[in-house]
């Protein structure tokens, strides 16, 4: 009899542990996660248990809230949360500016005009990860801007785009996102979409 009760309790606990799922936890912006540090970003095959999209077929005006401390972006249609993305915002000294903005530009195939590589005439990298403000061009080299696919300009030189996510703020001020999420955000916003960036 005692064994039967233990079995019932064990089965009940198993079912309770399965309830809610990932999305129930992600819908609460106060939920904390331990980020993957030092590994590849989600677009490079790493596991991303944070990002999701449920906005297809949902009506309502788009808006985005980015929480820098959480390194998360939340996509809303009307008042409904339809997507969450892991992000990597600006590192120390290149902080992503907090504030309220409206999307000013969309460029699917954008490349940086400030950060990238110096390459030779054949496209071989001569000097990697250069900053045009600081790094002199070697003789015969040309500048190739860092690719920023699905670029959504927020203000000045800051935008959201597909990029590497190491699990902490690492960019020059932009908000990097996994490729699948950059695409979803890109195709669901228009110029003028409100974006709020919170410290």
Regions found by a protein language model. Name each.
Residues 19-102, 111, 121, 198-199:
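Intrinsically disordered, low-complexity
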């Amino acid at each position: 009899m005692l064994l039967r009760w233990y079995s019932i309790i064990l089965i009940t606990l198993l079912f309770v542990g399965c309830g809610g799922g990932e999305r129930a936890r992600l819908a609460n912006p106060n939920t904390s996660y331990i980020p993957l540090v030092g590994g590849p970003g989600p677009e490079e095959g790493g596991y991303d248990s944070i990002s999701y999209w449920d906005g297809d077929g949902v009506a309502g005006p788009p808006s985005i809230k980015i929480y820098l401390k959480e390194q998360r972006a939340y996509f809303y249609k009307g008042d409904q949360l339809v997507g969450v993305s892991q992000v990597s915002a600006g590192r120390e000294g290149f902080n992503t500016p907090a504030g309220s903005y409206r999307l000013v530009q969309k460029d699917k195939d954008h490349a940086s005009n400030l950060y990238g590589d110096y390459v030779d005439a054949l496209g071989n990298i001569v000097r990697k990860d250069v900053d045009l403000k600081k790094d002199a061009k070697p003789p015969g080299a040309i500048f190739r801007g860092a690719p920023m696919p699905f670029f959504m300009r927020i203000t000045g030189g800051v935008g959201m785009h597909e990029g590497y996510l190491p699990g902490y703020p690492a960019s020059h001020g932009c908000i990097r996102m996994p490729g699948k999420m950059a695409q979803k955000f890109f195709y669901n916003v228009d110029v003028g979409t409100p974006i709020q960036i919170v410290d």
